Amino acid sequence: DVDERTRKTGEAFAAGLAPDCAITVHTQADTSSPDPLFNPLKTGVCQLDNANVTDAILSRAGGSIADFTGHRQTAFRELERVLNFPQSNLCLKREKQDESCSLTQALPSELKVSADNVSLTGAVSLASMLTEIFLLQQAQGMPEPGWGRITDSHQWNTLLSLHNAQ
């Protein structure tokens, strides 16, 4: 790919893999536009068939995005615990109105498919991003990933299932 982080990662990998060899990392000359090798959709090299992609994803999701999130409620509840979401202004307000409050209710997830992109929005997207951040905190040796609220492998596995699901 053409972004600096990817190029620098390639250079570091090559230097670590073969420190005594002068391995050149190759990228396309124009780093201001997407590389078709890594981004064939964004560069228009190919396009998605919206109906087929949607059907395939929903089939894999269990029929709908609601089913997809429904099957992962245990993991979402664990994420809510780490985030202290029940104490958020939104949930406290809903509690006063005798309404339930969850990430999946507050941020409904939606599948978006176009000729050049597929994305999941809402709680699914947020959960994937946040759990990856927690994983990076752990990998970087931070003493208390997730504000110190992730303490055992079961919690890690549960949370990372949200990242892996997307």
Task: Identify the function of each model-found stretch.
Residues 3-166:
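Signature for phosphate-centric chemistry
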